[in-house]
Each structure stands twice: as structure tokens, then as C-alpha cells.
């Protein structure tokens, strides 16, 4: 123990305290264990609360010890001793009565506050927090309200990086929350994943806090975030409490978080539980306060509509109303129409009352699919299947087509163009209908040309007659493949005794192709997204329906381009991979985006003589501030060591966006896919391992360990210093949009006011290790970085030598990342456009980070103005 410490602790000589702060830090921390032992003896003395000298000695010694530990970076070595002293202090009362009989902080409380602040200063060190948190939680039982408040703030801060350490105390924390320590609510989402059972057991009491007036909005958002996590993990626990959430759907502050809960339940196939909230969702959709949430509300309403036919009609009515009110917003309108089409594919009757509205919309593929489920010309002719009766089927058909299928005759369709319309999904009763024809064919003397290729179209065209699809039993009319632009010519065979022609408006569209093989089974024709074309040459096919005649169709040969398109589409492995995993991809990308964002752009840098490296670029996702740093003109970029993972994520994000916006999968022929594939091909074989791009992206999704590697890479690149996750809208904001008041000086007119100034030590030149540090006074403004050998007044700053911010190529920390140097933890390096560099060292790490951040922001705004 240092002799000055000994004089203070053993002899209580307060005059030695002034000299103690001039002693070297390393001399102070020598023989620390004896020092702490002496401190505990003084603290536990019964006379300590009344002895002012002892109180002063303890406060001085603790202040000097914590300062020495902090400056020498030895907190991990002495954390156990500090925590032990804190535990001893907490055994004493934290309040005492003053002369006016009021509760005030006791001398022990002051020591506890100092120790807590010193320990939680290192909240990012898990070894320190593992020791500190169990003892700090004891402070929450204190009768001192101020100490409880400060400890709660410390624990909330530590929970960000130490969720596992806190999770073992989850029940204790939940109990404190329920009893009134509402500030601890912010901790709950951080510890749920590591210890779920206490939350499930106490969920009812936690949800009741939403109605408590003392709980502020941010704390309610944390509760809803916790509920969303429960919905993703164990939805059956949350579903009984859903009615309590309904009232918050119309709250502008809480609606987004509640909609996230609903989306989580939908992803877990619990949509039926949300049907009771459809009236409230309709009110939210019609309100102008929830404009930003309309796309999400639209998706939730559509998913509820797919639960039953009754809900389908109600949902379509609301979606059509939403479409009418948002005709000027193409992106939202497209999302609404996609959801309407999805409901219509299951319950076509829900679309009938809105036929006129759909016809007024501009023609598009989505509108064609919607109209493909509607009967525009023959709504008054419902067709039914009665007990699978073939006779009833034929009688109904004859009412529509006349004697299109009759004994002794043959109706021939000559189509001069190949069909160009899209395929719709195969009706679920197509198989039963086809089996009726098969059974009748086998029992009767049917005349047919061939069993080899028998095809027809089932479903309804945009301009063709068809029957509506009922809820439990549907029947699709038989129509020959044709497009709305194809002329249909009917010719009756000479042996036919009577002839009937179809109405002039009849122009059926091919909706679904099926074929009958030699085994007599009817199957959908395999293919891609476009209708199956007929093979080269004139092919005549027959579909036996009853005794006597058969219906025959002739199709012209495909041209070479269409045939090539179909073959490539059928072989599109990427399309098939994504098509079968749509929901999985959307859920996966949603989870990934909460951990880190996905790049908006990738480039490959390098020449023939240098190693190629991929650069990934990120932008601010909200751009809510006019002084936003990372926009389309200027992106946050760095070279990555894991191009395969990033390209895989970019591919999944591309598919997720295509599915969400257009309801379709982006195949290998899309421009975005080809761009990503080109980046992959530009990388060296040592990186790609000669793996094809489509093989790489159709492999298993990157797991949590792979994601941790990317998070570490982002951290080393300084990404999290400039971007933060906004939990209210699940977007990554740049520092300018999160705190616009901090960067306003960079974008103000003039740009000459100082933003940051102070002394920095500088080194220049190639052989920097041979030179000594030169202390200079630097001033950073939005215009330039000025420096001199001494402090200069503002009016003389323009005459100082300066570095143009637009000429700075990059700034990097020398105390962070893989190549960090322990001797330069307080330093950062500036690279300029003329290939020169300058190393600057601040007085401490905090000051170095401040300079680094301000320089990055100033550079970004300078480059944005230049572009």
C-alpha cells in the first residue's frame, strides 16, 4: 500500500489527500487488496454514519482508486474487489433522517452510488457485468428512491450487451416491474430470448400494465415488443390476451408495434385468432393517422379474408374501398390489388360486386388475374354439379353452348395464334370433373383419335362464359385455349344433323392446362409461369365427353423464341426454389433486418494485377431528416470478407421485395438477379470456390453463427457508430436522422462556425514511427479542418492552413478493428485524395471517437453537396 494511502486509512490524515492525486496510477493500485480490506473495516464501523472524518477518508480513497483503475484499464482485475465493497455497503441503511426529520441519503448510499457508477461505466465488458449485476439488483430493494432510479438506469444500459447475465434474474426483474418499477420494462425484451418461461407465466400481469397511466409510451412500446416476441415463439400463450390489445390499434404511437404482433401471429398460422379484430382494422385503414401503416393493415385484412368466405367478402369490400382512396399511390394500390387477387383465387364470389370498379382500372397482369375469377358476361347462369351427375353436367352445358357437344357431330376450332394469356391456379375440383369423363369414356363406345395428348382448359377467361365457384363445390366450364385477340372459327361436320354457333362475345381464355396420359389419369401440364404452348406442327387432340361426338382443337406451331422461353423458364431452378419458400423467405428476412440491415448495393473493386474485393454499400432507410447523411448520393461502404453471405442476403431481400410489391418471384432473367450474379462472377476463384451463383443462393440460409460474423464485421467497420435500429418502424436510421440537432451545424448556411475544436497530436510522412508527435490546435467546421500551433480567434481561422473535407478520402480508427494497435487506442488516421495520410491522437478514447464521428458526418455532407 502506498504510504499516502496508509496515512489516510490508518492515521486519518486528511492533509495527505491533496498529494494522493499526484501519485502515479500504478503506484495507487499496488497492494489493492489491503486497501479494500481497510475500507470495509471503516465502512462497517458502527460509528461511521456519525464520523465525518471517516466519511471523508472513504470518499477520497474510493475516488482515487476508481480513477486509477479506470485510467490503467484494469477494471477486469479489480472488479471483484469493488463488487465486494459494494455488497458490504448495501448491508447498511441507504437513508437517514436529517434535522428536519426528512429522509436523506445516508453516508453508505453515497459510497454505493460512486461504486455503481464506476462499475457500470464498463457495461460493455461481460466479465465485469457478470459480477456486478447480481449485487446491483439488491439496490432495487432499497428504500432510497433515487438510488433505485439510478440503478434501474444502469441495468437498462447493461441489458443491451448482457441479456444472458440478466436473464437468470428474469423473475426478480418481472416482480419489480409489476410492483411499480416501470422503468425496468425496457429491460424485458433484451432478456426474454434467454429465459422465456417466467414471461409466459407472468404475461397477464405484464399486459395489464398497458392500461396503467403511470407507464409512459416508450415503456408501452417495450411491452408490445415483448408481446411480439412471444407471438413468434409461443403464440398460443399470447392469443387469449389479444382482446386487450384491440384498443391500442387506433393509437398513433402504438399501432405500428401492435401491427407487428398481428403479422407475427399470421406468420405462425394463427390468422383465425385475428378475425375478431377486423372492424378495428377497417377503422384504422380509413383513418388518415395511419397512412404509413396502410400497407401492413392491407396485408393483415387480406390474410383474415382468406380464413372463410364470409370474412373474404368483408375483407374485399374494405380493400376495394382502400384502393379507391389510394389511386394516386401506385405502390400501395399494387399491394392492395395483389391481396385482392389472393383472396379472389380462393373465394371468387367475394369479387362479384366490384366488377365495375376493376374494369375501370388500367390493364395490368394483376387486374387480368382478378378478372380471371369473375363472370362478366354470364353472371345470371350459375352452374352446379348435382351428386356428380354427368347427365346434369351435360344438360347445363347445353344451355350455354347449345348443342356444342352432341351425337353425330364434331365441332372443330381452328386457332391461328398461340395463346398468350397467363395460367391461373388449377381448380381444386378439376380432378373430380376429369374423372367423371374418364369413367363415362370407359363405359361407353367413345370415338377418339388418340390417348397420347389430350388437353383442355378449365377456368374462366376475362371475356368467356364460366360458372362461379361455390364455397364447397365448384365447377369450371370447359373452354378451348384461345386469347382475346384470337379469332375463333366454327365448322360443323357434314354428318351433323343440326348446328349451333356461339355468341359473338364468346372468346374464352386458357386458364389451366391439363393432359390425360395413356394410363387414363388427368394431370396438370408441367410448366412455368406462361401458358403451355402446343408442340411444333398441327396437333389434333380430343377430349371424350359422352357417347358420339368429340370436341377437337387445332393449334398452330410455336415460334422458336417462345419455345426457347418456355424451356428456360421450366429449367429456372432459382424460380422454383423461391416459389416454394415465399413465406419462409419473408419471415427470415424480417428477422435478419432486426439484427442488421441488408446492403442496397455491391461493387467489386480491383484490377488484373490486384486482388478483387467486394464493397457493400448501405443507406439510411428512413431519410426522415433533411440533413440525412447516407442517401442515394453518398452511401456507407466498406470492403467485406464475406461476399457470399452478403450476396445471399441481397438475393433473398430482392425476392422478398418482389413478392411483397408485385406478388411475383424475380427469376434468373430479372435485371437485379443478373447484377448480383455478375458481382459473384467478378470475384476470384479463391473466394467463390468455383461454386455457381445459383448453387450458392439456393443453399441453406446463413445461420446465426454466420450472421454473428457479419455483425462483427459491421462493428469493425464502424457501422453501428453511424446507424441505429429504430424499433418503432423496424428501420435502420443514420445518426443524422436519429439526432438531427447534433448535425445541424454541418448543413447551416455559411458553414464557418466551429463544430469541434481542441488539441490533437499529429504525425505525418511515410516513416511515422521515426517522428515524434507534434501538438497542434485543430478546429473542425462544416467547411474545412483547420490547424495551427496555438489557439486562434474565430475571425483569424480563415487564414490558417486547412484540409478541404471534400479531399478527405476516408477516416479510420486505429484503436478498433482487426488491425487495431494498443498503443494507438486514442488515435485515428485521415487519408486524403493526394495519397497522403495524417495520424491524429486525442487526449482519450472518448474524445477520439467524438472527432472520428464528427469528421465522418462532415465528410458525408461535403460529398453530398459536391455530388
Curated annotation (Swiss-Prot):
It is found in: Cell membrane. Residues 480-505 are annotated as: Disordered. SUPFAM superfamilies: ARM repeat, PH domain-like. It comes from the Eukaryota. Pfam families: PH. The keyword Isomerase does not apply. Residues 753-860 form the PH domain. Its main location: membrane. PROSITE patterns: PH_DOMAIN. GO terms for cellular component: plasma membrane. GO terms for molecular function: phosphatidylinositol-5-phosphate binding. GO terms for biological process: regulation of signal transduction. It is a peripheral membrane protein. Keywords: Cell membrane, Membrane. Belongs to the MELT/VEPH family. The PH domain is required for membrane targeting. This is Protein melted homolog. It comes from Caenorhabditis briggsae.
Amino acid at each position: 500500500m502506498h504510504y499516502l494511502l496508509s496515512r489516510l486509512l490508518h492515521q486519518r490524515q486528511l492533509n495527505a489527500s491533496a498529494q494522493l492525486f499526484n501519485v502515479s496510477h500504478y503506484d495507487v493500485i499496488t497492494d489493492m487488496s489491503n486497501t479494500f480490506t481497510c475500507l470495509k473495516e471503516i465502512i462497517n464501523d458502527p460509528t461511521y454514519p456519525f464520523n465525518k472524518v471517516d466519511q471523508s477518508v472513504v470518499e477520497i480513497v474510493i475516488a482515487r482508486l476508481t480513477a486509477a483503475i479506470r485510467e490503467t484499464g484494469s477494471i477486469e482485475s479489480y472488479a471483484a474487489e469493488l463488487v465486494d465493497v459494494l455488497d458490504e455497503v448495501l448491508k447498511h441503511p441507504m437513508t437517514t433522517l436529517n434535522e428536519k426529520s426528512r429522509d436523506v441519503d445516508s453516508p453508505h448510499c453515497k459510497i454505493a452510488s460512486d461504486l455503481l457508477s464506476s462499475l457500470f461505466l464498463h457495461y460493455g465488458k461481460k466479465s465485469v457485468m457478470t459480477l456486478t449485476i447480481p449485487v446491483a439488483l439488491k439496490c432495487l430493494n432499497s428504500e432510497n428512491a433515487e438510488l433505485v432510479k439510478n440503478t434501474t438506469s444502469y441495468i437498462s444500459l447493461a441489458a443491451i450487451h448482457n441479456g444472458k447475465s440478466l436473464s437468470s434474474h428474469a423473475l426478480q426483474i418481472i416482480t419489480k416491474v409489476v410492483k411499480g418499477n416501470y422503468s425496468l420494462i425496457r429491460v424485458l425484451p433484451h432478456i426474454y430470448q434467454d429465459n422465456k418461461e417466467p414471461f409466459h407465466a407472468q404475461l397477464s400481469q405484464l399486459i395489464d400494465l398497458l392500461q396503467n397511466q403511470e407507464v409512459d409510451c416508450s415503456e408501452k412500446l417495450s411491452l408490445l415488443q415483448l408481446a411480439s416476441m412471444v407471438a413468434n415463439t409461443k403464440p398460443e400463450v399470447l392469443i387469449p390476451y389479444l382482446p386487450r390489445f384491440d384498443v391500442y390499434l387506433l393509437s398513433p404511437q402504438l399501432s405500428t408495434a401492435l401491427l407487428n404482433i398481428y403479422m407475427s401471429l399470421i406468420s405462425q398460422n394463427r390468422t383465425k385468432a385475428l378475425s375478431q379484430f377486423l372492424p378495428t382494422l377497417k377503422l384504422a385503414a380509413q383513418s388518415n393517422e395511419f397512412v404509413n401503416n396502410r400497407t401492413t393493415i392491407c396485408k393483415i385484412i387480406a390474410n383474415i379474408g382468406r380464413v372463410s368466405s364470409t370474412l373474404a367478402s368483408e375483407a374485399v369490400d374494405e380493400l376495394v374501398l382502400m384502393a379507391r382512396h389510394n389511386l394516386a399511390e401506385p405502390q400501395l394500390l399494387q399491394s392492395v390489388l395483389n391481396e385482392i387477387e389472393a383472396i379472389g383465387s380462393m373465394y371468387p364470389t367475394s369479387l362479384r360486386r366490384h366488377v365495375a370498379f376493376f374494369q375501370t382500372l388500367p390493364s395490368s397482369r394483376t387486374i387480368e388475374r382478378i378478372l380471371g375469377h369473375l363472370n362478366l358476361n354470364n353472371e345470371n347462369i350459375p352452374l352446379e354439379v348435382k351428386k356428380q351427375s354427368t347427365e346434369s353436367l351435360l344438360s347445363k352445358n347445353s344451355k350455354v353452348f347449345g348443342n356444342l357437344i352432341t351425337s353425330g357431330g364434331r365441332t372443330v376450332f381452328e386457332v391461328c395464334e398461340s395463346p398468350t394469356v397467363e395460367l391461373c391456379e388449377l381448380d381444386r375440383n378439376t380432378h373430380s370433373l376429369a374423372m367423371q369423363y374418364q369413367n363415362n369414356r370407359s363405359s361407353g363406345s367413345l370415338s377418339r383419335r388418340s390417348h397420347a395428348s389430350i388437353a383442355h382448359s378449365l377456368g374462366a377467361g376475362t371475356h368467356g362464359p364460366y360458372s362461379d365457384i361455390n364455397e364447397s363445390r365448384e365447377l369450371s366450364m370447359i373452354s378451348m385455349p384461345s386469347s382475346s385477340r384470337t379469332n375463333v372459327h366454327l365448322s360443323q361436320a357434314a354428318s351433323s344433323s343440326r348446328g349451333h354457333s356461339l355468341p359473338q362475345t364468346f372468346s374464352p381464355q386458357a386458364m389451366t392446362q391439363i393432359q390425360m396420359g395413356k394410363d387414363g389419369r388427368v394431370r396438370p401440364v408441367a410448366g412455368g409461369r406462361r401458358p403451355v404452348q402446343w408442340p411444333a406442327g398441327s396437333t389434333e387432340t380430343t377430349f371424350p365427353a359422352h357417347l358420339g361426338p368429340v370436341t377437337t382443337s387445332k393449334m398452330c406451331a410455336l415460334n422458336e423464341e417462345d419455345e426457347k422461353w418456355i424451356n428456360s423458364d421450366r429449367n429456372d431452378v432459382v424460380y422454383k426454389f423461391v416459389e416454394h419458400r415465399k413465406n419462409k423467405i419473408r419471415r427470415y428476412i424480417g428477422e435478419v433486418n432486426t439484427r442488421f440491415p441488408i446492403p442496397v448495393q455491391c461493387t467489386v473493386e480491383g484490377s488484373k494485377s490486384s486482388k478483387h474485393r467486394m464493397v457493400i454499400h448501405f443507406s439510411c432507410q428512413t431519410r426522415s431528416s433533411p440533413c440525412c447523411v447516407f442517401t442515394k448520393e453518398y452511401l456507407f461502404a466498406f470492403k467485406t470478407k464475406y461476399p457470399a453471405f452478403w450476396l445471399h442476403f441481397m438475393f433473398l431481400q430482392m425476392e422478398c421485395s418482389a413478392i411483397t410489391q408485385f406478388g411475383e418471384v424475380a427469376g434468373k432473367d430479372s435485371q437485379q438477379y443478373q447484377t448480383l450474379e455478375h458481382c459473384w462472377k467478378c470475384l476470384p476463384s479463391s473466394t467463390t470456390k468455383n461454386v455457381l451463383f445459383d448453387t450458392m443462393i439456393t443453399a441453406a440460409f446463413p445461420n446465426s453463427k454466420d450472421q454473428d460474423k457479419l455483425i462483427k464485421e459491421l462493428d469493425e467497420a464502424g457501422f453501428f457508430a453511424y446507424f441505429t435500429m429504430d424499433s418503432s418502424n423496424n428501420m435502420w436510421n443514420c445518426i443524422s436522422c436519429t439526432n438531427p440537432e447534433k448535425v445541424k451545424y454541418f448543413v447551416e448556411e455559411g458553414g464557418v462556425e466551429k463544430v469541434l475544436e481542441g488539441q490533437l497530436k499529429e504525425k505525418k510522412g511515410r516513416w511515422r514511427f521515426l517522428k515524434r508527435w507534434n501538438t497542434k490546435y485543430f478546429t473542425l467546421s462544416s467547411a474545412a479542418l483547420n490547424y495551427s500551433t496555438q489557439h486562434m480567434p474565430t475571425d483569424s481561422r480563415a487564414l490558417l492552413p486547412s484540409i478541404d473535407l471534400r479531399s478527405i478520402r476516408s477516416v479510420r480508427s486505429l484503436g478498433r478493428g482487426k488491425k487495431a494497435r494498443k498503443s494507438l487506442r486514442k488515435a485515428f488516421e485521415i487519408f486524403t485524395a493526394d495519397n497522403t495520410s495524417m495520424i491524429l491522437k486525442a487526449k482519450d478514447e472518448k474524445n477520439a471517437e467524438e472527432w472520428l464521428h464528427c469528421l465522418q458526418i462532415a465528410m458525408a455532407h461535403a460529398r453530398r453537396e459536391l455530388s
